[in-house]
Amino acid sequence: NPSLSQHREKEIIDLIKRKKEQIEQINYSIKKGHFKRAKNVNFYVMNSLEVDIRPDGSLALPEKALSLLDFLIVSIHTQFNLSQEKMTQRILRGLEHPKAKILGHPTGRLLNQREGYELNWEKLFSFCQKNNKMLEVNAYPNRLDLPDFLIREAVKRKIKLAINTDSHALEQMEFIKYGVATARRGWAQKEDIINTQGVGEIKKILLN
């Protein structure tokens, strides 16, 4: 994903504009039946990115770039050692952006490598409930994040979950099975998982 640490603001906006145009062309072609494999299939491509939440809670892309996207997954990738209060404020501020719909790998843990950061889960769950924010079940084998005991708490509170593979290569899409298994251990049902819903319902949730 483009970031201000690697690209100038204009370069980022141009990259996302080109991506948006390409996705619009794909969706038009699907609608017109130009793709044989997509015929008779309700299929729609959304324009999204995973965006870093900076230590102050701001997002690591310029606002003009964010406005071109359909929705965001926001995540922590740096400075994991903040106090519980500061980390909680950081995440809640990141989630306040209207395009931010999903918190990615919410605990920040890496199995057998790194403990998760300190976070006030009661405040996060309450914020997600009030603002219709979702939590990711990251299926990458060294993450499995949200863990099952926190999935149970999210499900109790009717907070929607998104099972994502965090794929960086096509073959890693198979990791979805680990996310499904983790969600099941957390007693999640089909209705708790956004990406078990139909295209129309997913669009309604993510694009509003």
Stretches with model-predicted labels:
Residues N1-Y44, P55-N208:
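Charged catalytic cores and adjacent phosphate/nucleic-acid-binding surfaces used
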